Every structure is written in structure tokens, then in C-alpha cells.
Curated annotation (Swiss-Prot):
Name of the protein this chain belongs to: Mesoderm induction early response protein 1
SUPFAM superfamilies documented for this protein: Homeodomain-like (SSF46689)
SMART domains for the chain: ELM2, SANT
CDD domains per UniProt: SANT_MTA3_like
Organism the protein comes from: Xenopus laevis (African clawed frog)
Highest classification ranks of the organism: Eukaryota, Metazoa, Chordata, Craniata, Vertebrata
UniProt GO cellular component terms: nucleoplasm; transcription repressor complex
Main location: nucleus
Biased composition, class Polar residues, residue ranges: 120-130, 387-397, 420-440, 477-489
Amino acid sequence: MAEPSLRTASPGGSAASDDHEFEPSADMLVHEFDDEQTLEEEEMLEGEVNFTSEIEHLERESEMPIDELLRLYGYGSTVPLPGEEEEDEEDMDNDCNSGCSGEIKDEAIKDSSGQEDETQSSNDDPTPSFTCRDVREVIRPRRCKYFDTNHEIEEESEDDEDYVPSEDWKKEIMVGSMFQAEIPVGICKYRETEKVYENDDQLLWDPEYVMEERVIDFLNEASRRTCEERGLDAIPEGSHIKDNEQALYELVKCNFDTEEALRRLRFNVKAAREELSVWTEEECRNFEQGLKAYGKDFHLIQANKVRTRSVGECVAFYYMWKKSERYDFFAQQTRFGKKKYNLHPGVTDYMDRLLDESESATSSRAPSPPPTTSNSNTSQSEKEDCTASNNTQNGVSVNGPCAITAYKDEAKQGVHLNGPTISSSDPSSNETDTNGYNRENVTDDSRFSHTSGKTDTNPDDTNERPIKRQRMDSPGKESTGSSEFSQEVFSHGEV
């Protein structure tokens, strides 16, 4: 609904407006044309406004009664007065605070039905059918909901505040007369001057009167004398020394006189009984087997391996055993001392890890086999290189590739070139060379007489080292003999 302009309002109450909306043409919308003339016309019209007429209208409206002023601006007579508006606002606030949402909904339904009746009855009336009160009543549930949400937000904000602990949680050291309990007279069994127990305290040992070296000598002497009387201990003597409380107590009672303390220990029954608990060799072996099987579970060790001893004696023996040479031997055999419960973050199955460690240990202990070299492959390759070089003279082959292949076949059938030959005056002798070939099979053919004569020139060299190394040392000599050999072979014309 367009509001009427104040400058065009007539006193009679009719409202008319000379303003009209500017509707751009299609060309303006397509080409985004901005008509500056319209802007200039609007500025000119604004400049021609007479402010004196507006002031007169405002003065006239100030003198009008409220009913006429409402009718002037299009409102009916149903608008309540300011006093009534205040009362309605107070009622609305009370309704909102009470939180009666159901009643608010019913009132909204009734108001909407009343509005429908009013619209039907006042069809001829040009004034609108709704009033300020109706608008407030429609908006009222929203206001209540808004205030309720604000209340919830405030509660949430209170919950989100930083927690500040009270000072009561701080602990105080309760020392002093103010923290002492007041015991009634009839509950306490003892008086203030009366002792709780009858026996006096006895000093068992005082280390300030005797040097440590003298105490160690005294304990060694006491242990030696008792061992001579009762038998040697299964644990060998070492740098360790066992604290004998009974012997130290006897030394205190004798005013730290070592000779008198040793004499009393010899006739003391209690000390003799204590020394009777010497572990035998069988008990030590059973204890070590139990420690290997059950670990440090001394209850299982005592129940299954060392039944003649108590759990306390097993624990005491364990700490003595760890200081002895017997423990060093046991640790070397089983690596018990090195297993310090190592943590492995990436390992979940410790049994697989144990198997891997055992396999690696066995593989490291196994001797590695010596490297084997294939002499046959090297000798065959050297033989082929030698024959290829012997069949060429000045870079040109004598009889072509056919002669080379024939020579290789005859060489394989007739003689082993890598084996040294031994010279002999008797060609029919049954002596064999180092490779197991008979001389009579090799020297019968007249074609191989030159090679045998060539190799017989230096029998000492051939016997001392193999022909392979001789080829590398003197390639000139071998190449000469082999070339003569190839010439004799190819001269017969055999292919």
C-alpha cells in the first residue's frame, strides 16, 4: 500500500499523488541504457518543493483531534487510545510471562474469526480491516517465543561459563593441636606415663663403632667356620658376602669383640640352625631349572622344583645366586640376564619374533660353504679363443670356418689341450697325463707328433704349473706352436 504524500494531502482528507513509477523500455533493459534526463527532472522537481506548505500542514495536523487525524491517514475509529494501548501491552506481558501458549493460540484463532466477520460486514468501508491491536495480537506469540528463546540462551551462556573451583578442594596439612582428636577417658587403655608394651627395645646392630672392612672380615670368618662344620655351600665363594644378622647381633652383645663373638656363635644353637639351611647342589640345579621354566614366579618354582624350601628362602637364595659366579655361567648358557623384557612397539606376535631370532642365531653359527668355480667353463672358453686365434694368419683365415669346426672336432677327439703332456722315449708306454689320457692313444697319429715334441722341450715347467697359467705367461711361445700345429692339420686337406 503506497503511503500518501504529505505535500499533496488536502484538508478534506482526500489523498492524491502526482508521483508515478518510472518504467524503463525494452531498449533500455537490453542495452542497459541510463536515461540521465529523468534524473535531472527529478532533481528539478525536488528543487521546486515548497517547504512552507509542509510546515503549514504539520501545524494543522497538530491541532487536529486524534480521531480526525486517524481518519485522515486511513485508520478507523477502532484504534484504542494511548492509555488503552498501555493496558493492552501490560496484559500481553503478563500473558507472555505466564507462558500460556495454548490460550494464546485460542485467542489468535478467535481474533482471526472476528476479523473475517468484520471484513464481511464492512465490505463497503474503504478502510482496511486490520488494526494496530490486531497486528499486536498476531505478533504477540512471536514475542513470547522470542523472550523464551532469550531465556534459554541466557541459561546456555551460564552453563558455558568457565568453571571456577571453590577453595574448599585445596588440601591442608592437618598438623597441630587444633587437628588432634579428643579421646574420651574410658576408651584409652594406657595412661600417659605407661608404656604400650612391656619389653624394652634392643639394639641389633650399630655400624658406627666398627669399620666396614673389619665387619666384612668378621662375616667371612663366621661363614668359613660354619661351612667347615656343616659342609661347603653349593654357591662358590666370590666377592659377595651374606649379611648374617645373628652374627652381627652377637658382635654387638660382645661389645664389638670379634673373637668373643665367633666363640659364642660356635655354641649358639640358633645360629647353627640358620647355617643348616645351606643349599645343596641338587637344590641349586632344580632352582635354576625352575627359573628357566617359570621365570621369577617363585611360587611355581617352590611348588614344582624346590619343595624342600619355602618361597621366602627361594627369594633370598635368588638374590645371593645373582651375585655368584654360578649366575654368570647360567646367563652365558641361557642368556637369562640379557632378556630384560625388551619392548617392541611394532611386534604383536612375540612367538614369531622368538622363532626369527632363533633362526638367525643358527644361521649365523653355520659355516658358510666355500665358493665353487667352474673350471670346465673357463677352460672351454679359453680353448675356443685359442683355436680361433691359431686358425687366422695376418687377419685372414686359412681354410675358412669349415676348417675351424673340423679342427675343434678333431681336437676334442684326439687330445685335451688344457692338460700337460710328459715326454717319454718309449711311445708305447702306458703312462697317463694329469687329465687321465694315455700317451699311446695320443701319439699314434703322426699329426700330433709336433705338439708332443713341442711340449716335451720343458718338462719341468709343465709339471710345476698348469698349462693355463703358462699360456698367460708366455703367449708368444704357445701361439707359435699352435700355429704350426694348425698348419700341419690343414695341410692334409681334411675338412
